[in-house]
C-alpha cells in the first residue's frame, strides 16, 4: 500500500466497500475503472483497456468513459447484469488543496434505473421483495421510476411464483432465509430476475399495514432502494395493498401459450394481444394496458364500469378522435415526476411537464361534453393552473439539456440574473467591436477573437499573417503557439475578460440555484400530478379499447348469471389482424352447466389450437373491460385459465416434453374450479400411444366428474370420441377439411360431431416431403388399417366409477410381482444401491412418508420426477 499513490489509496478504500459493484471513479471529465473492474467493463463495453503507471513493474489495468455520456455505458453494464457504483468528486478541484473528497452517490441496479434512456417507455421497471414465515408469504414491489408501490400476501409458493411472473421484476431482493431450491425456481420463472441480499437494517418510514409480514416485505424493499439510491424518494407513493384473488389467475405457461405480451417464436411484442390492443397515446397508458392484460378483473361491477366508458367513447367518434389528439401531447407524467423527486430532472423535462398539464383542461372540457355519469374520471381531473403558471413564467421554451450551463430562464424572471446577463451581453458586444478595431489596426482581416475554457479570451492570428508582424508594436503578448497560428492577449482584453467571465459565471451559478428552487417547488405537486397521471392512463386505455373495437368490428360482451359461455361468430383477434379480415373464418362455441367439455378433432393445421386460444383470449379481453371479436358474446366470469398448448422441452430444468405436459396438466386438474377455463391441446402425445390415450381419457373423466371446469380438449386420439356416450357433459366437435383429388383443403370451420381421420399424410404432402416418403407412408397406413381396423378397442373401455384404494398391501404385492423376473440376489443388490448413502436415505424416508391413498396418478408422477432429479 505504501507504493500506491494517495489517489489510488482513496480508490481502493472506496472499492472495498462496494465489492459487488463496478466502481465508476470520477477523475475530472471521466469516470475511470481500475483492476478487475476495468477488465470486465472494457470487455462488455468494447472500449480500450489501458494501463496506469505503464512504466512501473506492476501497471494497473484501467479504462474510462466520458462523464457527459456515461448513462449509455451504465445502461449497457446494468443490462448485462452488473451493478454500477457512481463515485463523484464532492469538492471543486480548483478550490481544494490536496486530495479531492469523493463519495459513492448512487448504485445503479437493474431494478433502480432512473435515466430516461435506461428504461422502456412502455414497460414498468419493477423491483420486488418477499419474506416468508411458513406458511405465510408477503410480497412487495415498486417501480422507482414512477413511484408505484404495492404489497400482498398469500399462503403458498405456487402463488409466489405466479405473482413474480406476472410482475416480471428486473430485480428481486430477498433475505438470508430463502432456500436455494426456491431461488432456483425464481430464476427459472423469468430470465431477467437477479437475486440480491438486503444491505442494511436501517428503517425508513412507511405506512404500516395491518399484516406484519407485509410490513416487513415493504421495509426490506424500501431499505434496499434507499441504500442504493442515497437520496430523497418522496415520489414513492403510499403502499397499496392488493389481493391476487381479486384478479383472474394465469400462470407463466398460460400467458406464454396464449402470447399475451410476448410472442413465442420471436420473443417480441409484435403478434401478441398487447400488440393488437395498444392504441394508447401515452407511455403511461401503454404501461397501464399491460397491467390490465396481466390482471383481468373478476368483479362484474368493475368490468361493466370499464365497458360503460368504452361504450361512451365508441358512441362519440369525433370526441374520441379529439381526445387522442390531446393525449398525444401528454408526455410521461409519472416518470417526469419521478425525476423531479429524484433530482435528475432537467429543464426540458419540466417543459414536457408544462405541455402535459396544459392539456388537462382540454381533456376535462371534452369529457364534460359527454356522459358525466359514465365518465366518473372527469370529476377527478384537476387543471393545475398554479403549477402551469410557475413553469410558463420561468423557463424558456427550448432550454439546453444541461442545467449547469445557463440559458434556462426567461428575461424578467429574476432581476439579479437579468443584470448578470446584460453585463455578459454588453461584454460580448464589446468583444465584437474590439475584433473589428484590431483587424483595422493590424491590417489582418482574418484576425479573430476566440474563447476556450483553458485560456479564456485570446486574439488568434494565422501563421501566414505573422511574417511581417511584430506583436509588441500592438501591445500583444504571446499566449499559445499552434502549428498554424499564434494566440495573443492584451491588457485591455484581459481586463474585459474578467468582467465578462465574472458575469457569465455568476449568471450560470445563479441559474442553477434558481433551477433547484424551481425543482423543489414542482416537487410539492408530486401527489396531485401522480393522481392526474393515473386518471389519464386509464382514459388512454379505455379510448384504446374503443379504437380497436371500431377498427376491427368488435362487440360488447355480456356476462351470464348461469355460467354459460356462448360465442357467435368469434374470431382470434391477433390472427385476424395478421390475416386479411375478410379471409378469417369465424366460429361458434357454447359451453354451459350441462355441456362443459368440447372434444375437438380435425387435421393438423386445420385451426384447432387457434380456435381454443381465441376462446381464452376473448374471455381475457372481456374481463379486461374491452369489446371482443364476436358477433355476440355471452361469458361467465372465469377465476382462472389453464393451458397446455404446444410441445416444448424445458431444457433449463431438464424436463422432457411429456413431463412438462404432465406438470401443466397437474396444475389444471388440481386447482381448476367450475369457474375455470381449461385449454388442453393434444395431451399425451409425448409418450406411447396407449399411455397417452389412457391419460387423456382419464383427464377428461376427471374434469367431468370433479371440477366441472369449462374445457376445450383437442386430440388426435379418435378413440376418445366415443366418450360422449358415457359423459353427457362432453360434446364432440371437429374442424372441417375436405380432400379433393388427393389434396387437403382446410375449411377452418368448427362443426358438430367427430372425424376419424387426421389426414396426416396429406398434411405431410403439403409440407413437400419427398414423394417416395409419401408413397411409402400410404402403403404402410393401408397395411395398418387392414390388419387392425381404424379404431383401437381402447375407446370401449368402461369408465372406472370407483377407484380401488391404493394401500401398502397393494404396493407390496406389486413389488413382489416385479421381482419374479429378478434373482433374489439382484433384487437385494438393487435395493442396497438405491439407499446406499445419506442422500438416498433421505429419499427412502420421503417415499415411506408418502400418503399414497390421497395422491392422484399425476401427483405421483410429479413426485417421482422430483425424486429422480435428486438422484441425478
From Swiss-Prot:
GO molecular function annotations of the record: ATP binding; ATP-dependent DNA damage sensor activity; damaged DNA binding; mismatched DNA binding
One Pfam family here: MutS_II
Annotated keywords: ATP-binding, DNA damage, DNA repair, DNA-binding, Nucleotide-binding
One annotated Gene Ontology cellular component of this protein: cytosol
Source organism, top-level taxon: Bacteria
An annotated GO BP: mismatch repair
SMART domains, per the entry: MUTSac, MUTSd
Positions contributing to ATP binding: 602-609
Matches recorded under NCBIfam families: mutS1, PRK05399.1
Family under the similarity heading: Belongs to the DNA mismatch repair MutS family.
Function summary: This protein is involved in the repair of mismatches in DNA. It is possible that it carries out the mismatch recognition step. This protein has a weak ATPase activity.
PANTHER family per UniProt: DNA MISMATCH REPAIR PROTEIN MSH1, MITOCHONDRIAL, DNA MISMATCH REPAIR PROTEIN MUTS FAMILY MEMBER
Record's protein name: DNA mismatch repair protein MutS
Organism: Staphylococcus aureus
Amino acid at each position: 500500500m505504501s507504493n500506491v499513490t494517495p489517489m489510488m489509496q482513496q480508490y481502493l478504500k472506496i472499492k472495498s466497500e462496494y465489492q459487488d459493484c463496478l466502481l465508476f471513479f470520477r477523475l475530472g471529465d471521466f469516470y475511470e475503472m481500475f483492476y478487475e473492474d476495468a477488465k470486465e467493463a472494457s470487455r462488455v463495453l468494447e472500449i480500450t483497456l489501458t494501463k496506469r503507471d505503464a512504466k512501473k513493474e506492476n501497471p494497473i489495468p484501467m479504462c474510462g468513459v466520458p462523464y457527459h455520456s456515461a448513462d449509455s455505458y451504465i445502461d449497457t453494464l446494468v443490462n448485462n447484469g452488473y451493478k454500477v457504483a457512481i463515485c463523484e468528486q464532492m469538492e471543486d478541484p480548483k478550490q481544494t488543496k490536496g486530495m479531492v473528497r469523493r463519495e459513492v452517490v448512487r448504485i445503479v441496479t437493474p431494478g433502480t434505473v432512473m435515466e430516461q434512456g435506461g428504461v422502456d417507455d412502455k414497460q414498468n421497471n419493477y423491483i420486488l421483495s418477499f419474506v416468508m414465515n411458513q406458511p405465510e408469504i408477503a410480497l412487495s414491489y415498486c417501480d422507482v421510476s414512477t413511484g408505484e408501490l404495492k404489497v400482498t400476501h398469500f399462503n403458498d409458493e405456487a402463488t409466489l411464483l405466479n405473482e413474480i411472473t406476472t410482475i416480471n421484476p428486473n430485480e428481486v431482493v430477498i433475505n438470508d432465509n430463502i432456500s436455494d431450491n426456491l431461488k432456483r425456481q425464481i430464476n427459472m420463472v423469468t430470465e431477467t430476475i437477479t437475486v440480491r441480499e438486503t444491505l442494511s437494517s436501517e428503517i425508513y418510514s412507511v405506512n404500516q399495514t395491518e399484516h406484519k409480514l407485509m410490513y416487513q416485505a415493504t421495509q426490506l424493499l424500501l431499505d434496499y432502494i434507499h441504500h442504493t439510491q442515497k437520496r430523497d424518494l418522496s415520489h414513492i407513493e403510499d403502499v397499496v395493498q392488493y389481493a391476487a384473488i381479486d384478479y383472474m389467475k394465469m400462470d407463466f405457461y398460460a400467458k406464454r401459450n396464449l402470447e399475451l405480451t410476448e410472442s413465442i417464436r420471436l420473443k417480441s411484442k409484435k403478434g401478441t394481444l398487447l400488440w393488437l390492443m395498444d392504441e394508447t397515446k401515452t407511455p403511461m397508458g401503454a404501461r397501464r394496458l399491460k397491467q390490465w392484460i396481466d390482471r383481468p378483473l373478476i368483479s362484474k361491477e368493475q368490468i361493466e364500469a370499464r365497458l360503460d366508458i368504452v361504450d361512451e367513447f365508441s358512441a362519440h367518434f369525433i370526441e374520441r378522435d379529439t381526445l387522442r389528439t390531446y393525449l398525444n401531447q401528454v408526455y410521461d407524467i409519472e416518470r417526469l415526476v419521478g425525476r423531479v423527486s429524484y433530482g435528475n430532472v432537467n429543464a426540458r423535462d419540466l417543459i414536457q411537464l408544462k405541455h402535459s398539464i396544459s392539456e388537462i383542461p382540454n381533456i376535462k372540457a371534452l369529457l364534460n361534453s359527454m356522459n358525466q355519469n359514465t365518465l366518473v374520471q372527469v370529476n377527478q381531473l384537476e387543471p393545475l393552473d398554479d403549477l402551469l403558471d410557475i413553469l410558463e413564467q420561468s423557463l424558456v421554451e427550448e432550454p439546453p439539456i444541461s442545467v449547469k450551463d445557463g440559458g434556462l430562464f426567461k428575461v424578467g424572471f429574476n432581476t439579479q440574473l437579468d443584470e448578470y446577463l446584460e453585463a455578459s451581453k454588453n461584454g460580448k458586444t464589446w468583444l465584437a467591436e474590439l475584433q473589428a478595431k484590431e483587424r483595422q489596426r493590424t491590417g489582418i482581416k482574418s484576425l479573430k477573437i476566440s474563447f476556450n475554457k483553458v485560456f479564456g479570451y485570446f486574439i488568434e492570428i494565422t501563421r501566414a499573417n505573422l511574417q511581417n508582424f511584430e506583436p509588441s508594436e500592438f501591445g500583444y503578448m504571446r499566449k499559445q503557439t499552434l502549428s498554424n497560428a499564434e494566440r495573443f492577449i492584451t491588457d485591455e482584453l484581459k481586463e474585459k475578460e474578467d468582467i465578462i467571465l465574472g458575469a457569465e459565471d455568476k449568471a450560470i451559478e445563479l441559474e442553477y440555484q434558481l433551477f433547484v428552487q424551481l425543482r423543489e417547488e414542482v416537487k410539492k405537486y408530486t401527489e396531485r400530478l401522480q393522481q392526474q397521471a393515473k386518471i389519464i392512463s386509464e382514459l388512454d386505455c379505455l379510448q384504446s379499447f374503443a379504437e380497436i373495437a371500431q377498427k376491427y368490428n368488435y362487440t360488447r360482451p355480456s356476462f351470464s348469471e348461469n355460467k354459460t359461455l356462448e360465442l357467435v361468430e368469434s374470431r382470434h383477434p391477433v390472427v385476424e389482424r395478421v390475416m386479411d379480415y375478410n379471409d378469417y373464418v369465424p366460429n361458434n362455441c357454447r359451453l354451459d352447466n350441462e355441456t362443459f367439455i368440447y372434444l375437438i378433432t380435425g387435421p393438423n393445421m386445420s385451426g384447432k389450437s387457434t380456435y381454443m386460444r381465441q376462446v381464452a383470449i376473448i374471455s381475457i379481453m372481456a374481463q379486461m373491460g374491452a369489446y371482443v371479436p364476436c358477433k355476440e358474446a355471452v361469458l361467465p366470469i372465469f377465476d382462472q385459465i389453464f393451458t397446455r398448448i404446444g410441445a416444448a422441452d424445458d431444457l433449463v430444468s431438464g424436463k422432457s416434453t411429456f413431463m412438462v405436459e404432465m406438470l401443466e396438466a397437474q396444475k389444471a386438474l388440481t386447482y381448476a374450479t367450475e369457474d375455470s377455463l381449461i385449454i388442453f391441446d393434444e395431451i399425451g402425445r409425448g409418450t406411447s400411444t396407449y399411455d397417452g390415450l389412457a391419460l387423456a381419457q382419464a383427464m377428461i373423466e376427471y374434469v367431468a366428474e370433479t371440477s366441472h371446469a369449462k374445457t376445450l380438449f383437442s386430440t388426435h386420439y379418435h378413440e376418445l370420441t366415443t366418450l360422449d356416450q358415457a359423459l353427457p357433459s362432453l360434446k364432440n366437435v371437429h374442424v372441417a377439411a375436405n380432400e379433393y383429388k388427393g389434396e387437403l383443403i382446410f375449411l377452418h370451420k368448427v362443426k358438430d360431431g367427430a372425424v376419424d381421420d387426421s389426414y396426416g399424410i396429406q398434411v405431410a404432402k403439403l409440407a413437400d416431403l419427398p414423394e417416395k416418403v409419401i408413397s411409402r407412408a400410404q402403403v404402410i397406413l393401408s397395411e395398418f388399417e387392414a390388419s387392425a381396423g381404424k379404431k383401437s378397442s381402447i375407446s370401449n373401455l368402461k369408465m372406472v366409477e370407483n377407484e380401488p384404494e391404493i394401500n401398502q398391501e397393494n404396493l407390496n404385492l406389486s413389488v413382489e410381482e416385479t421381482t419374479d423376473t429378478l434373482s433374489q440376489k439382484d433384487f437385494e443388490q438393487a435395493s442396497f444401491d438405491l439407499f446406499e448413502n445419506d442422500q438416498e436415505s433421505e429419499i427412502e424416508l420421503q417415499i415411506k412418508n408418502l400418503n399414497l391413498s390421497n395422491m392422484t396418478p399425476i401427483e405421483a408422477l410429479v413426485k417421482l420426477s422430483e425424486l429422480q432429479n435428486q438422484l441425478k
